[in-house]
């Protein structure tokens, strides 16, 4: 049968490309400030490419936040710093 792994647990995966080497600790801190303490932030490809994996998160109404909304929140936070 099908064996589930972390890739199938749900959530949002984002790939962000920077013009210069990414500061991973800063990216992690910015993502954690949004309430994603369990997010994974890592380089892939080059030091300028960052993959961010966000776990499923519920909104104030108890329903899961849409991936597009999560992505927009993270990109807004990363662009603000």
Map each language-model feature to its residues.
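A structural signal for conserved, well-ordered secondary-structure elements
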Residues: 1-81
């Amino acid at each position: 049968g099908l064996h589930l792994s972390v890739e199938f647990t749900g959530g949002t995966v984002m790939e962000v490309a920077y013009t210069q080497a990414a500061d991973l600790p800063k990216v992690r801190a910015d993502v954690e400030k949004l309430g994603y303490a369990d997010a994974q932030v890592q380089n892939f490809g080059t030091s300028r490419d960052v993959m961010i994996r966000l776990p499923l998160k519920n909104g104030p109404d108890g329903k899961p936040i849409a991936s597009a909304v999560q992505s927009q929140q993270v990109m807004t936070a990363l662009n603000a710093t």
